[in-house]
């Protein structure tokens, strides 16, 4: 509760599939977001090969009383290679969006890319399906972070090792509207610096300012 007291004392196994016991492999990197009505969603990386090939991104919804709303479900549509580093954000209208890193070079065409999938308030996937977030495909795109924006959309940030414009690692972001459409193209958040193995910008985080401006901060 707001005072820090435990309201529901028993821990739960998020990644267990009903009727089949514990999943094989590891379930790691859990992230969660609160949803409308007091419920929440947990997303994580599954290493058992349930998505057909290597690591996959799965999620599970819960109501306000910690009751699971169905079994865990697969988020990524592309099952080739590794999907990892999930992040999740609550959206206006009761839905949510999951972002992650994929090293399926056949989709991004160059190393790792950042992908997004949006879900509606009832937990059903939005019609746009799996979306490639990054515009540039130079090098790899890693460690996505995501935040809701004041206009009902959301912002995804990540870092790239593509050495663009003479820089080494750089942080970029992409804005989306409430329907999952891109608003413009990706934007560099970090200041370009000469290529130097000892200078890099990575591990981004996003915060929406607690005012009516709609401004946000990326670190």
Task: Describe the role of every protein-language-model region.
Residues 1-219:
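Extracellular, repeat-based ectodomains that mediate carbohydrate processing or recognition
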């Amino acid at each position: 509760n707001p005072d820090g007291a435990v309201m529901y004392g028993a821990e739960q196994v998020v990644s267990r599939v009903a009727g089949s016991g514990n999943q094989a492999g590891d379930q790691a990197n859990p992230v969660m977001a609160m949803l409308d009505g007091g419920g929440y969603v947990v997303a994580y990386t599954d290493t058992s090969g349930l998505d057909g090939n290597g690591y996959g991104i799965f999620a599970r919804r819960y109501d306000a009383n910690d009751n699971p709303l169905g079994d865990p479900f697969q988020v990524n549509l592309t099952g080739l290679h590794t999907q990892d580093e999930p992040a999740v954000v609550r959206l206006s209208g009761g839905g949510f969006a999951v972002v992650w890193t994929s090293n399926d070079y056949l989709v991004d065409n160059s190393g790792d890319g950042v992908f997004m999938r949006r879900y509606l308030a009832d937990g059903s996937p939005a019609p746009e399906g799996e979306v490639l977030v990054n515009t540039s495909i130079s090098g790899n795109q890693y460690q996505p972070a995501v935040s809701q924006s004041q206009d009902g959309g959301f912002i995804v940030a990540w870092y790239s090792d593509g050495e663009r414009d003479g820089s080494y690692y750089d942080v970029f972001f992409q804005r989306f509207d409430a329907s999952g459409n891109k608003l413009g193209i990706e934007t560099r958040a970090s200041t370009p610096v000469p290529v130097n193995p000892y200078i890099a910008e990575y591990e981004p985080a996003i915060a929406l300012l607690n005012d009516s401006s709609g401004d946000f901060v990326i670190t």
